[in-house]
Swiss-Prot record:
Phylogenetic lineage: Eukaryota, Metazoa, Chordata, Craniata, Vertebrata
Enzyme Commission number, as recorded: 3.4.24.65
Catalytic reaction equation(s): Hydrolysis of soluble and insoluble elastin. Specific cleavages are also produced at 14-Ala-|-Leu-15 and 16-Tyr-|-Leu-17 in the B chain of insulin
Glycosylated residues in this chain: N69
Propeptide cleavage-removed residue intervals: 18-100
Motif (Cysteine switch): 85-92
Species per Swiss-Prot/TrEMBL record: Oryctolagus cuniculus
Keyword Acetylation among UniProt keywords: no
Subcellular location: Secreted, Extracellular space, Extracellular matrix
Binding site for Ca(2+) 2: D153, G185, G187, D189
Requisite cofactors: Ca(2+); Zn(2+)
PANTHER family: MACROPHAGE METALLOELASTASE (PTHR10201:SF267), MATRIX METALLOPROTEINASE (PTHR10201)
Name of the protein: Macrophage metalloelastase
Family: Belongs to the peptidase M10A family.
Amino acids binding Ca(2+) 3: D170, G171, G173, V175, D193, E196
Amino acid sequence: MKFLLLILTLWVTSSGADPLKENDMLFAENYLENFYGLKVERIPMTKMKTNRNFIEEKVQEMQQFLGLNVTGQLDTSTLEMMHKPRCGVPDVYHFKTMPGRPVWRKHYITYRIKNYTPDMKREDVEYAIQKAFQVWSDVTPLKFRKITTGKADIMILFASGAHGDYGAFDGRGGVIAHAFGPGPGIGGDTHFDEDEIWSKSYKGTNLFLVAVHELGHALGLDHSNDPKAIMFPTYGYIDLNTFHLSADDIRGIQSLYGGPEQHQPMPKPDNPEPTACDHNLKFDAVTTVGNKIFFFKDSFFWWKIPKSSTTSVRLISSLWPTLPSGIEAAYEIGDRHQVFLFKGDKFWLISHLRLQPNYPKSIHSLGFPDFVKKIDAAVFNPSLRKTYFFVDNLYWRYDERREVMDAGYPKLITKHFPGIGPKIDAVFYFQRYYYFFQGPNQLEYDTFSSRVTKKLKSNSWFDC
């Protein structure tokens, strides 16, 4: 260590760069060793120039790869880049995929979350990981399935310090995660530094964004030198509402696995486009989706931004080609970016506007008795974390935290929702109010006072 520190000191002095503190030089040495393959031979002082040249080349290599001004000197911008949180996988391979192009020789891949960070709720960890896998399955033919016991292809672990592989974590900051390329044993395994503060938002370190990056490695991708790519080595928060893979990420992963399986051609609509201002207009289902409200009717849906004149009508198949027409119920869990759609005895999950794999599922998996064949309407209450399902003159209540139907249900709609009678066509929640749709009319229902506060036409949202 002292020998290499001496070389770094002499090199910085001879290069004309500003003098560096000893801890900066030690940090730079460690960084170049870990990520750029710096190795300095113990040679006589007379040949030390060779080592200085080698160090300068490694600094230049790092600067070029990370898009810095290539000077070969440990200047301020270079040290700042070195101090950014990053992935623990080296940058030395100048390929979009790992050396030898390791890939999974199958399209159905299992994963298991061995333990959970205490920084986040268990369901939020599972959702972030599932969503990260979905990013890659959307652009490849790969399918991912979570298992809870045994050995999975990709084992996911939260750990601190040394944890049984080649790379001990270094505490908060620095290396935040690493992963291994496809293969047996440790191949594909993905590790997150527990000393980081993991989150589902911009605070701390966003688990979803880091997981997308690390799972790229687990699928065979190496680091990219494109700053817009999720496979760029350093971490930076990206707005989750606008996040998408870069062209470089997609080219890399599709060079290994090809593109996604092709869907059937978009079917023609079964019904003509409905008229928004028809006074007899009835909706099949209504739900919020982010900052919009979606109104479903036959093969179409309108989306509307509240308190805005912006309204648009589209075919359901234009957004989700494999979904059927005639959606009968819908609800959103906004903080999870999840929308559930129902038709007959089946339901589908939409996440970030993407149809999720392994759906549709049976409504009976939610706990409905066998006599329930369809759902008329559904709505999620974000304050209670409960979803209400309406069927004829009855309703059920589902606990979204525990993922189980509450005991003591069904109950009569008229008894517990004063002023609301069966049968309900659609319902959604917006700013403390439920909006119940029955035929061409809707009722505004105050969840605080448990009473109907307004009677409106169903299409009043369209400024008709």
